[in-house]
């Protein structure tokens, strides 16, 4: 099963989503596009259980995460954009 999680440039680099994730799917990586100089990344997306804790933890309600399960199915984690 193919997984891709996209976290768009609305991330403010606060690390709330990283700390909330029970399966350590997310991590912060250097990124010059925000004041914090870092952005959430998802190197271990195969471990995502779709719990939406990252969504709940996001203080700006702009975290955008999508999980793509193969070509036919797209499961949105329900995050605002």
From Swiss-Prot:
Complexes and interactors: The eukaryotic PSI reaction center is composed of at least 11 subunits.
Its EC number(s): 1.97.1.12
Its biological purpose: Apoprotein for the two 4Fe-4S centers FA and FB of photosystem I (PSI); essential for photochemical activity. FB is the terminal electron acceptor of PSI, donating electrons to ferredoxin. The C-terminus interacts with PsaA/B/D and helps assemble the protein into the PSI complex. Required for binding of PsaD and PsaE to PSI. PSI is a plastocyanin/cytochrome c6-ferredoxin oxidoreductase, converting photonic excitation into a charge separation, which transfers an electron from the donor P700 chlorophyll pair to the spectroscopically characterized acceptors A0, A1, FX, FA and FB in turn.
Annotated disulfide bonds: none
SUPFAM superfamilies for the chain: 4Fe-4S ferredoxins
Cofactor descriptive note: Binds 2 [4Fe-4S] clusters. Cluster 2 is most probably the spectroscopically characterized electron acceptor FA and cluster 1 is most probably FB.
Protein name per UniProt: Photosystem I iron-sulfur center
Reaction equation(s) it catalyzes: reduced [plastocyanin] + hnu + oxidized [2Fe-2S]-[ferredoxin] = oxidized [plastocyanin] + reduced [2Fe-2S]-[ferredoxin]
Main location: plastid
Names of the cofactor(s): [4Fe-4S] cluster
Biological-process GO terms, alphabetical: photosynthetic electron transport in photosystem I
Superkingdom of the source species: Eukaryota
Top EC class, one word: oxidoreductase
InterPro entries reported for this sequence: 4Fe4S_Fe-S-bd, 4Fe4S_Fe_S_CS, PSI_iron-sulfur_center, PSI_PsaC
Keywords, sorted A to Z: 4Fe-4S, Chloroplast, Electron transport, Iron, Iron-sulfur, Membrane, Metal-binding, Oxidoreductase, Photosynthesis, Photosystem I, Plastid, Repeat, Thylakoid, Transport
Boundaries of every 4Fe-4S ferredoxin-type domain copy: 2-31, 37-68
Residues reported to bind [4Fe-4S] cluster 2: 21, 48, 51, 54
Recorded GO CC terms: chloroplast thylakoid membrane; photosystem I
UniProt subcellular location: Plastid, Chloroplast thylakoid membrane
Pfam families listed in its UniProt record: Fer4_7 (PF12838)
Membrane protein topology class: Peripheral membrane protein
Lineage: Eukaryota, Sar, Stramenopiles, Ochrophyta, Bacillariophyta
Gene3D superfamilies assigned: 3.30.70.20
Residues holding [4Fe-4S] cluster 1: 11, 14, 17, 58
HAMAP family: PSI_PsaC
């Amino acid at each position: 099963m193919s997984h891709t999680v996209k976290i768009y440039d609305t991330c403010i680099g606060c690390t709330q989503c990283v700390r909330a994730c029970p399966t350590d799917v997310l991590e912060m990586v250097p990124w010059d596009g925000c004041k914090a100089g870092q952005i959430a990344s998802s190197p271990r997306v195969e471990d995502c259980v779709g719990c939406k804790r990252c969504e709940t933890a996001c203080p700006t309600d702009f975290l955008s995460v999508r999980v793509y399960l193969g070509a036919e199915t797209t499961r949105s984690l329900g995050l605002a954009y």
